[in-house]
Amino acid sequence: MKLNELYNNIGAKKNKKRIARGIGSGKGKTGGRGIKGQKSRSGVAVKGFEGGQTPMIKRLPKRGFNCISTKKYNIINIYNIEEALADGRLSADDNITKEKLVEARVVNNKNNKKLVKLLSICSDDFAAPLSLKLDAYSSKAKDLIEKAGGKLL
């Protein structure tokens, strides 16, 4: 026996039925879709339609609302500022503002629309005395900066 003489056992591999390929094929003309109607057309599914019963979207109650006065903050941590100071992207001598954080690529803030809040996650000690002018601070971040001799403007 050679490679070119290999073949499947009889009945091991069945050819799929090719639909809509002539009336004599057994699945021709309408191709198993019946006659007329929505389901015989292309793009059959109607989103959310459940066959006449009240759809799930209507059975569930409306809940909540979107508060327009909610403040959305860009969250940064003290270690993000430490990394930027170590890389030389920020200077410890200057007042650190939102604009300087954007320039140093610590905050991604398009058009300065979002506020910036400083947290102290993963930071228990902070040595550099910085003067910061941001929109909000966590209580632990305030304590760490003031303990290091920094100022919150």
Swiss-Prot record:
Annotated protein name in UniProt: Large ribosomal subunit protein uL15
Top-level taxon of origin: Bacteria
Pfam families assigned to the protein according to its UniProt record, in alphabetical order: Ribosomal_L27A
A GO cellular-component term linked to this record: large ribosomal subunit
Gene: rplO
Job description of the protein: Binds to the 23S rRNA.
HAMAP family, sorted: Ribosomal_uL15 (MF_01341)
Organism expressing this protein natively: Rickettsia peacockii (strain Rustic)
Similarity field: Belongs to the universal ribosomal protein uL15 family.
Ranges where the record places region Disordered: 21-42
One Gene Ontology term from the biological process aspect of the record: translation
Quaternary assembly: Part of the 50S ribosomal subunit.
Keywords attached to this entry: Ribonucleoprotein, Ribosomal protein, RNA-binding, rRNA-binding
Biased segments, Gly residues type: 23-35
A GO term, aspect molecular function: rRNA binding
